[in-house]
Every structure is written in structure tokens, then in C-alpha cells.
């Protein structure tokens, strides 16, 4: 007889093969049709809010792995809070203005920016930004990110621009914004100032020089020496800045030596601490220290410039160090922040002998018209010929490059608009104390950056940006920015967008009869031509998008990459504190690392080591990408490679197939008829107690944003607790007990509670798969069967929980089971048995082993998946395996000493007796 018909064979429509690349787009369509995002908001309407404010990606280029990591983490967090009873609006946004888009359209469309009208050029930029918003949006949706995709915020939208103008106006009114001539990062390839966040450092080769500046006027202090033989020796890595030298800085308290070259009689003034090093570099083998003086001894002396007809003043500065160079610091106020401040303190005029295009001006004499990098070898050769070069070396140093064009930049003084961060640094640092930083060291990093930063250069010499809303009086020439002008500009931008600034005259923007607040005249005004730094745009999103449009402030969370400590986190904090004095615009600040290849290297086209998210979607599925984001300790750099995704796919299959097994065995289960705890075997309650532990661990890990702990815990639960132990044991109950027996229904109850819990716990991470599981499983009337995310995560099932003593007993039993399994493997290898049901086990336990001594041998046989267990108390733990006695039951394969006429064991005979229609 075929007893297969009498067995509860597992069956479900849930497929073993995931087919995610094909299945996920179908699920996305279903989510869209049911308006899942808004349904989720309705579910939690009126409950406490969790608001993750989206840091806007730049609308330039297609989706990359950095985007994928960032958006996956955000969606995991938002979903996890939504499934724990929080109202979770998520409004995606984009950062649109800035040089990257200008550079891209000039290159792609071969546009001549200077030959086009400003309005036409800006329109082309707008269209380009819109194009990539669409491309990126589709990629983010493909990941499964839930959000208000119909109403994203964009920094180029008129409404946003109107509110950003108000942020500028508020900071200007407080005196935090000013225009000044001071050194800034300058990209002469793109002809614009740059913020610190727009700088990347690369190792570049360079020639470093030690240059002699002959003594010109010693103020009568060194008349006993031959002045014609005496020189200050400076050191620099930027030869091209030497035409801009106005001073030599010494430390006031350090000792400076006058060193005589015993071979030629020349004398050099260098820091005493660096004499040996400098003489070695200059290959001066025979020298004598003639005398020493503190740095302040030389103040206001004059040295002769080595190749231009001018002098250089000796000044004092505390920043001069003794760890490199000569202790005599080349000082060019047009090319350095410290240089600028020092020369300003001495009342010296600003000199900037390099123009916007990076070429020397006429101030540089014979070098006029040369690009700075072209002038380096020429100046070097001229100094050699003039005898002013003391020494030179070839080194590799870290040098700033433009983040967009990747070319070296210079530090150059130009008229720019600045935000005086010094004016509110203390308030900004204090605001950090009210923020939860993840990782915890974030607060120190942010405070350090704020304390050490210079004033923020917020102006750009670009066309595609928000115009700086400042006018200039034609009579007195002073800048004009008042409440009245800000209101007028904001209203104009709200109605017509910021293009109107370039298309309208100042008189048509300002209120009729407007008079200059400085001189009272109203003869005429001109408009500022510079645009705002893109970081000011994105730094204003907390007000322009979040507070104004979304109606809440501050955000619960900002979550971005590590680079945003000097980028969006900082610009948002500075505008919030500077404009409104309301503290940080976020309660929590979470950061993730960079995405790198499998070997930890940055991904570059030249290395061919990049990973495209689209390839992951098409080959593995978005759930595997989400699992990748969740499985990594994302606070460090996150590795990605095909091998990593293949391994993750294997882990995914373990989860999927474990859930499939449970679904298979729940096909006839009605969850309204759960087995009560008091009617449930201890093994089933043991599983639910372990499930309770998992629930608590996952809950805490979601709170801590430690998703890799969740993925590890769920994987371990599926592999170790379920597949390797519980599911293996209960197969006999599920398949061979009567379909509606108490024993089978109890196991199904445990499976149902477990599957429901796993689907909910893991739904924020495996959004597609857990929803697929949810759709395939049975539900109660309290469930929202439409989508798993519309349900709250399960809380521990305390009614089923075992006490600590019972759990300890079962941990011991599991240890013994491991020993039994080892003995079974040895017997199988020795050909004593085949399947474990072909074995009888003789188990000896110590007399004091109260946990095992009281166990029912029949229950132990089920636990060990053998036909029989004989238990002996007394002696060391020992396991003996023998061939099972009796007859093999053709239905359950257990061996029985009392089979019926058909060979069925008593249990199977009883089950089959109640199935006459199958016989």
C-alpha cells in the first residue's frame, strides 16, 4: 500500500526559487496600486512621529552603491519605526544647484556658457537636473524605498528658493554674513571659489625649495656682521606663490641661529632647532653657529626679495612650528589664511598676483601671463641662476584638488561673501550636546570641525545657483540687504523662480521708492552677480523643505556618509543656529562609511572594480542589496563585490527555505485555533521562548541601528534553532500525526507564531520577501493581510515562555543531543546504521544529572530522531548505538516491536484507522 497518501505532505504556492529580479517589480506595482506609503501613514496617524529628513543627493549621474547603501539604510529605519507604532513621513529630496551640473552639461552638450544668456544656460541646467532626478528616483523606488515620490523637495524649486532667501536674510540681519577680501580655495579651471567640503586631497609630486632672502635692513642690530653675506632661509612647496611674498614669519619665542658656511662665508638665519637638518639639505658640511637670538629680536627687519625689486618684512606668528622647514615661514597674504591674518595685523596691503584663470598678473614681473604650474620651473631656474636657491628636493605631498574637475586648486584672496562662523561657534557646539550621535564619537568630530573651521565662504562665481539676494547702492556703493529687500526677493522667487533675478532690473525687484538704508539715496541699485554655495542650499533644507513644507522641526534623524560631518550635517547645523538660534535641526545624527570593493579599495573606472546597483537588481534582486546594507557594520567602510553578493544570496536562501518549510506545513492551519500554552509540549514552548529572546534582541538592535546584529541573529535562529534542531525534530509530528491531532496543531502553533514573527521582524530589511511570505501565510482578523509593513512587529509571547530552570534543563539536553549525534555519525560511518531511525540508543547519564534522569525515553527518542532510547542512570555520560530492534514502519520509518499485520507501528496504525477512505 502507498502510505504517502496518509501523510500530511507539505504543500504551498510559495516557490523555493526566489526569482527576485522578476518578482520584485511586480510587487512594486502592487505597492503603488495600493498606495502603500499613504496607507502606512494612515495606520499610524496620530501616533508619535519619527521623521528621517532625507539628505538630498546631487541630481547628477545615475545610481551608485553609495546611493544604494544610504537609501537602503534609511528605508530600513523608517519601516522599522512604522512597524513599531510611529508616524513616519519620508519626503525624498534632491540638491540641484552647483558646478557639477554646469560642468556636465558643458561637456555633454558642448555648450559655451559665456556665449549663452544666463537664463538659457540656467534652463539647460534645470532640464539636466530634472532628467537625473527621474533616473535616480526610479533607482530608489527599485530598492523598495517607501516615500512621497509624488512630492519630493528640490532645492531648485521656486518655493524652496523663496524660503532659502529668508535663511540668508536672517543670518545677514544678525551680522553673520559679510563681504571681504581674504584667501579662499579657488579652482582656476572652473573659475570659482570652493568650500572646504568641495575639496579632495591627493598625493602629488612637487619640488620643495629652500630660498635665501638677503638681509636688507637689520635695524642696526647686526652691524657687527657683514650684511652682504647674511640671508634668511625660507622653505616652501608652492614656488609660484613667491612673487606674492610680503613677509617672513618667525616664532617670537623660539631661538634662531646665525649659521656661517665655513666654506664660502655666507651666513644663514634659521631656527636653532632645525640647523642640523637645514644644513644637511643644503649640503653644507662645515658650518659654525655664530650667535643666536629669539625670534622677536628680528621683528620689523627687512629682507630683500630673491628675484623681484621689493623687500619682505620680518613678522612674528605663534603658528610657526619647528617640525619642518627652516622656522622662517614664507608669508604671502594673497595665498594663505594665516599669511593674510598676520599681514593684516601688521597693517600690510593685500597683494594677489594671480588672476581668476590662475595666471600671474603684472605684479609678478616677467612671469605675467603664465599659469601657476607653468611658472614653477621658470622661477626655480631663475633662482638657481641668481644664486638665491639654497636647496631643493623632490617630494610627494597631499595637495587639495577640486572635487568636480579633479584638478589642483590654489588658495587665493578674492572678494567673496562669508558667513562669520566665529560669531556663533559656541552656540553651534552647545547644540551638539542635545543630539544623539551614532557612532558616539560623532559629537567630538563635529565639535572639533566647528571649532577649527575658518569663516564659511558662501559665494560662488557660477550661474547655476541661487543668486545672493544683495543689492548695491549706486550712490554710496554699499551692499544692501534688509527685511524689505528679502521679502521682495522671496516673493519674486516664489512666483517666478530665481531666473527672474537675472532677467529683471534691480528697480523692478525692489519696492517702489526704496531708499538705501546707508545713505538714504534712491537713485539706483545693482544686483550681486555671485550665487550661493550649494552647501548653503542643502544646509537650508531643514527650514525650506522640512519646517515650511512638512510642518515639523527638528527632524528626528539625519543619516548620511562620514563626509557629511564637514558637509550637510555641518551646514545644516550652522544655518539652524545662525539663522534661528533654535539648536540643531536633528535629534539624532547617524553616519555610515564609504562603499569600497571586496579588497577595501575605492571603486574607480580605471580599476574596473565598480559594482553597479542595476546589476544587483538584475542578477540578485533588491532584497539582496538591502541584505548587504543591513549585514555590514556600516559605521566602517562597506565592502561590495560579486563574491559578497553571492554569499549573501546563500544566506538569503537559508532564510527563504526555512520560511517555505513553515509555510508548507501551515497550509491547513487556522490561526484562530492556537494551542494554549498549558496544552503544548515543552519542546514547542522551548521554541517560542527562544523566539521571545530573538524578538527582544531584534527590538533592541533596531533601537540601536545595529542591523548587522539583526541579520546575524535571524540567520542563526533559522539555521541553528530551527533547521538544525526544532524543524528536524517535529517533521515526524507534522507529517505522521493525524492532521487535526493536538500534537500536530501544537507544532503548527509554534510554527505560525515563529513565521509571523520572522516575517515582521525581518520585513524592514527583506521588504519584498517578507511581504511575499506574509501574502502566503494564514491570518487572523486582527492582521492587515494586504502587506506585512502595515502590521506592528510581534511582542514576546510571554504566556508560552518557559522559566529559566526549564530552559537551562533544555540547554543541557541539547548538549547531550550533540553527543548522541556524534555517536550516530560514527555508527553511520562504520556502516552500523544508515538513517538515524535505524538506530536504538543506549544512553548512560550520571546519577546527579537530574535534567536527564527524569526524561521520558520515548520523548528522548523523538528528540534524537531515533527509534528507541534506553536510559541508564549511574556512571559517566556514555552513548551506545545499535541497530534498531523490531520492524520498520512503512509509514514513519520508525522501528517497532509491536507492529500490526501491515507492519505499521501502533501510532501510525491508529492514525490510518481513522482514514478509511484512503485505504
Model regions and ranges:
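Residue patterns forming the tRNA-binding/recognition surfaces of aminoacyl-tRNA synthetases
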Residues: 2-13, 17-20, 26, 30-34, ...
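N-terminal catalytic cores of NTP/NDP-binding nucleotidyl/phosphoryl-transfer enzymes
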Residues: 42-103, 234-241, 315-342, 346, ...
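Secondary-structure capping and boundary motifs in well-ordered enzyme cores
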Residues: 44, 48-55, 65-69, 73, ...
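Acidic, turn-prone loop/beta-hairpin segments
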Residues: 95, 184, 188, 194-200, ...
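Short cysteine-rich clusters marking metal-coordination/redox-active sites
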Residues: 187, 402, 473, 516-519, ...
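Cys/His-coordinated zinc-binding microdomains
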Residues: 191, 461, 477, 520, ...
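Protease-associated
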Residues: 247, 254-328, 337, 341
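Alpha-helical recognition segments enriched in aromatics with Gly/Pro capping
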Residues: 313, 318, 346-358, 462-464, ...
Amino acid at each position: 500500500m502507498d502510505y504517502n497518501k496518509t501523510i500530511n505532505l507539505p504543500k504551498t504556492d510559495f516557490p523555493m526559487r526566489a526569482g527576485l529580479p522578476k518578482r520584485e517589480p511586480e510587487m512594486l506595482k502592487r505597492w503603488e496600486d495600493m498606495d502603500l506609503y499613504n496607507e502606512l501613514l494612515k495606520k499610524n496617524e496620530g501616533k508619535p512621529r519619527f521623521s528621517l529628513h532625507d539628505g538630498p543627493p546631487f541630481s547628477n549621474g545615475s545610481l551608485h552603491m553609495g546611493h544604494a547603501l544610504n537609501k537602503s539604510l534609511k528605508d530600513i529605519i523608517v519601516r522599522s519605526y512604522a512597524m513599531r507604532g510611529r508616524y513616519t513621513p519620508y519626503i525624498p529630496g534632491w540638491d540641484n544647484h552647483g558646478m557639477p551640473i554646469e560642468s556636465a552639461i558643458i561637456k555633454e552638450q558642448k555648450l559655451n556658457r559665456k556665449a549663452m544668456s544666463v537664463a538659457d544656460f540656467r534652463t539647460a541646467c534645470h532640464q539636466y537636473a530634472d532628467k537625473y532626478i527621474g533616473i535616480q528616483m526610479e533607482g530608489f523606488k527599485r530598492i523598495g524605498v517607501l516615500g512621497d515620490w509624488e512630492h519630493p523637495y528640490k532645492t531648485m524649486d521656486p518655493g524652496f528658493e523663496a524660503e532659502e532667501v529668508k535663511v540668508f536674510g536672517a543670518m545677514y540681519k544678525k551680522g553673520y554674513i559679510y563681504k571681504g577680501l581674504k584667501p579662499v580655495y579657488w579652482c582656476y579651471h572652473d573659475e570659482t571659489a570652493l568650500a572646504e567640503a568641495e575639496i579632495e586631497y591627493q598625493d602629488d609630486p612637487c619640488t620643495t625649495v629652500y630660498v635665501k632672502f638677503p638681509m636688507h635692513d637689520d635695524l642696526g642690530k647686526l652691524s657687527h656682521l657683514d650684511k652682504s653675506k647674511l640671508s634668511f632661509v625660507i622653505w616652501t612647496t608652492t614656488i609660484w606663490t613667491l612673487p606674492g611674498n610680503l613677509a617672513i614669519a618667525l616664532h617670537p619665542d623660539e631661538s634662531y641661529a646665525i649659521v656661517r658656511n665655513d666654506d664660502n662665508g655666507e651666513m644663514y638665519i634659521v631656527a636653532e632647532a632645525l640647523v642640523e637638518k637645514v644644513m644637511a639639505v643644503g649640503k653644507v658640511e662645515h658650518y659654525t653657529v655664530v650667535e643666536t637670538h629669539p625670534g622677536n629680536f628680528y621683528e620689523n627687519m627687512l629682507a630683500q626679495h630673491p628675484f623681484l625689486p621689493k623687500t619682505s618684512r620680518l613678522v612674528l606668528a605663534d603658528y610657526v612650528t619647528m617640525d619642518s622647514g627652516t622656522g622662517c615661514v614664507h608669508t604671502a597674504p594673497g595665498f594663505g589664511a594665516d599669511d593674510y591674518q598676520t599681514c593684516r595685523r601688521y597693517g600690510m596691503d593685500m597683494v594677489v598676483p594671480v588672476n581668476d584663470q590662475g595666471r600671474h598678473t603684472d605684479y609678478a614681473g616677467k612671469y605675467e601671463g603664465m599659469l601657476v604650474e607653468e611658472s614653477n620651473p621658470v622661477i626655480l631656474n631663475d633662482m638657481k641662476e641668481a644664486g638665491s636657491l639654497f636647496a631643493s628636493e623632490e617630494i610627494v605631498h597631499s595637495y587639495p584638488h577640486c572635487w568636480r574637475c579633479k584638478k589642483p586648486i590654489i588658495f587665493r584672496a578674492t572678494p567673496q561673501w562669508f558667513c562669520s562662523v566665529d560669531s556663533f561657534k559656541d552656540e553651534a557646539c552647545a547644540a551638539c550636546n542635545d543630539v544623539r550621535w551614532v557612532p558616539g564619537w560623532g559629537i567630538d568630530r563635529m565639535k572639533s570641525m566647528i571649532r577649527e573651521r575658518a569663516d564659511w565662504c558662501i559665494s560662488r562665481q557660477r550661474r547655476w545657483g541661487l543668486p545672493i539676494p544683495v543689492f548695491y547702492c549706486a550712490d554710496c556703493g554699499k551692499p544692501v540687504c534688509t527685511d524689505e529687500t528679502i521679502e521682495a526677493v522671496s516673493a519674486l522667487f516664489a512666483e517666478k523662480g530665481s531666473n527672474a533675478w537675472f532677467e529683471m532690473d534691480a528697480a523692478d525687484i525692489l519696492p517702489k521708492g526704496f531708499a538705501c538704508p546707508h545713505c538714504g539715496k534712491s537713485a539706483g541699485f545693482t544686483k550681486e552677480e555671485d550665487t550661493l554655495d550649494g552647501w548653503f542650499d542643502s544646509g537650508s533644507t531643514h527650514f525650506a523643505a522640512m519646517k515650511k513644507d512638512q510642518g515639523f522641526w527638528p527632524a528626528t534623524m539625519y543619516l548620511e556618509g562620514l563626509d557629511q560631518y564637514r558637509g550637510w550635517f555641518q551646514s545644516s547645523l550652522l544655518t539652524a543656529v545662525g539663522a534661528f538660534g533654535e539648536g540643531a535641526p536633528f535629534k539624532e545624527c547617524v553616519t555610515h562609511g564609504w562603499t569600497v570593493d571586496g579588497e577595501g579599495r575605492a571603486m574607480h573606472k580605471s580599476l574596473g572594480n565598480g559594482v553597479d546597483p542595476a546589476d544587483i537588481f538584475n542578477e540578485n534582486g533588491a532584497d539582496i542589496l538591502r541584505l548587504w546594507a543591513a549585514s555590514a557594520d556600516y559605521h566602517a567602510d562597506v565592502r561590495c563585490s560579486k563574491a559578497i553578493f553571492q554569499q549573501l544570496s546563500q544566506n538569503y536562501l537559508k532564510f527563504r527555505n526555512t520560511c517555505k518549510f513553515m509555510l508548507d506545513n501551515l497550509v491547513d492551519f487556522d490561526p484562530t485555533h492556537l494551542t494554549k500554552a498549558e496544552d503544548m509540549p515543552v519542546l514547542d514552548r522551548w521554541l517560542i521562548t527562544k523566539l521571545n529572546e530573538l524578538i527582544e534582541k531584534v527590538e533592541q538592535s533596531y533601537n540601536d541601528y545595529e542591523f548587522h546584529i539583526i541579520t546575524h541573529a535571524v540567520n542563526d535562529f533559522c539555521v541553528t534553532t530551527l533547521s538544525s534542531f526544532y524543524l528536524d525534530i517535529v517533521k515526524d509530528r507534522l507529517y505522521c500525526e493525524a492532521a487535526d491531532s493536538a500534537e500536530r496543531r501544537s507544532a503548527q502553533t509554534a510554527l505560525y507564531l515563529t513565521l509571523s514573527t520572522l516575517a515582521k521582524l525581518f520585513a524592514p530589511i527583506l521588504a519584498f520577501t517578507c511581504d511575499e511570505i506574509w501574502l502566503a501565510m494564514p491570518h487572523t482578523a486582527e492582521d492587515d493581510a494586504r502587506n506585512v509593513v502595515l502590521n506592528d512587529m510581534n511582542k514576546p509571547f510571554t504566556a508560552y515562555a518557559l522559566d529559566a530552570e526549564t530552559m537551562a534543563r533544555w540547554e543541557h539536553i541539547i548538549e547531550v543531543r550533540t553527543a548522541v549525534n556524534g555517536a550516530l555519525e560514527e555508527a553511520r560511518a562504520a556502516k552500523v546504521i544508515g538513517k538515524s531511525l535505524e538506530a536504538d540508543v543506549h544512553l548512560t547519564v550520571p546519577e546527579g544529572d537530574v535534567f536527564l534522569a527524569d526524561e521520558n525515553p520515548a520523548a528522548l527518542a523523538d528528540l534524537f530522531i531515533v527509534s528507541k532510547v534506553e536510559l541508564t542512570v549511574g556512571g559517566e555520560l556514555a552513548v551506545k548505538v545499535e541497530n534498531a530492534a523490531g520492524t520498520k514502519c512503512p509509514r514513519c520509518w520508525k522501528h517497532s516491536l509491536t507492529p500490526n499485520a501491515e507492519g505499521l507501528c501502533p501510532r501510525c496504525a491508529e492514525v490510518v484507522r481513522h482514514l478509511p477512505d484512503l485505504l
